[in-house]
Amino acid sequence: MASVSSSPSYSSQAAVLLLLHQPPHQHGHGGACLRYRGSQSQGRGNAVATSLGLSAAGRGGAGGLLLLPPLPALRAAEGKDGRAVTKDEEEEAAAAAVEEEGEVEVRREEDKPGDDGSREAAARGSGSGRFSADYISLGIREPVYEVIEVKSNGRMSTKKISRRQLLKSSGLRLRDTRSVDPSLWLMNSMPSLLVREQAILVNLGSLRAIAMHERVLIFNYNSPGGKAFLDSLLPRLNPRNINGGPAMPFQLEVVEAALLSRIQRLERRLMRIEPRVGALLEVLPNRLTADVLEQLRLSKQALVELGSRAGDLKQMLIDLLDDPHEIRRICIMGRNCTLDKLSDNMECSVPLEKQIAEEEEEEIEMLLENYLQRCESIHGQAERLLDSAREMEDSIAVNLSSRRLEVSRVELLLQVGTFCVAIGALIAGIFGMNLKSYLETNAWAFWATTGGIVVGAVAGFFIMYSYLKTRKIL
């Protein structure tokens, strides 16, 4: 059985060896040789030589070599299905390999925030690397958040952090980040203060932040809530403002700054709306114009929004005060303390830390109660102004209804008068026809007819008016 092989060299010419029971032997020149043996092999060799156009002189003896001319190089590379790979397929495979290397390199660049990212990628193994390549090939990008990081010493920096790095550094779970994810602001508009083992998630309107033991990450820092929070937090972290007293834990400073900034924003909004509503309440009873009514509508809408936000914040603070477990979890954050699952008591390895945590628990309760009172005051004032605006709307509606009633009465009286006059016009029309009544020959007939029409119309009007008054229609 004969087979064909080729040498994997890149020269312009290659030797093709036909193997007949013996392995091929290279000859001195650039061609190939054929070894044959025996009579059967010799006959077979003669046939091959004749077909290739060689003379018998080039053949050896019984075991001689048959010289073959140089042939073009054949590709020895084979595909997975056993067929030879063409040049185009080899170029496509090389391009695919280069593209795959580029994708894996891009994935490594994204996943490498430092040495931690390299160690994490090495720990995941080859399977995770395959997942990363598929992650990019599908066009799916891991969410990357642009946040401001404020440390406990007051240093502030802007950074980009992926969701995986965020979960790893804060010890949170994926479902925990939904309350602070800026892309889900329509689904998590309710204010919340979630306490976890290593972080506190703050969601107060446009303010979204994650407070940890030594730093805080602020999302949407360009929003009004984020700017107000930074203006309230940074002065607290200045060592000159401590006045030598004991400093509060950093996470408590963050919580208080967040609540303070939110309450102050609500108070400023109330202070802008209250004078405007008061001025409208004084003007409206005597001046019912379209502009004044439109201002009343806008003010009422602003009061409804303010009352809703203050009410949601008040309910969040009430729920937090009703759950002492959450307050204790805030106190033990960053300390070697745990909470007993049965009695919910704090257990600390150092007695001093337990004493400090208990004192902080009382401070947190007083802090929350203080902001709860301010929030209730805002909510109550907004509700009172809203009630006044609604009462004014009811008064305006009654006033307009009374005016419409007066217009309807006048219109009815005019219709009655018109009816009575129409009867007189009917009589005049009858006499105005070209019929001979023989009254036109008498001078007194005109005055008698005119007086009768006027008296009849007036009498008919008073009769209809008394009837409508009796039926309480007028």
Swiss-Prot record:
Locus of motif Required for magnesium transport activity: 432-434
Q: Which InterPro entries does the protein's record reference? A: CorA_TM1_TM2, MRS2-like
Q: Which domain of life is it from?
A: Eukaryota
Region Disordered, as annotated, extends over: 79-129
**A molecular-function term among this protein's GO annotations:** magnesium ion transmembrane transporter activity
Q: Which GO terms describe its cellular component?
A: chloroplast envelope; chloroplast membrane
Membrane topology of the entry: Multi-pass membrane protein
Q: Quote the biased-composition stretches of kind Basic and acidic residues, using this chain's numbering.
A: 104-122
Location relative to the cell:
Plastid; Plastid, Chloroplast membrane
* Keywords for this protein: Chloroplast, Ion transport, Magnesium, Membrane, Plastid, Transit peptide, Transmembrane, Transmembrane helix, Transport
What is one Pfam family matched by this protein?
A: MRS2-like
Similarity annotation: Belongs to the CorA metal ion transporter (MIT) (TC 1.A.35.5) family.
Q: What does this protein do?
A: Magnesium transporter that may mediate the influx of magnesium in chloroplast.
Q: What is this protein called?
A: Magnesium transporter MRS2-A, chloroplastic
Tell me which species this is from.
Answer: Oryza sativa subsp. japonica
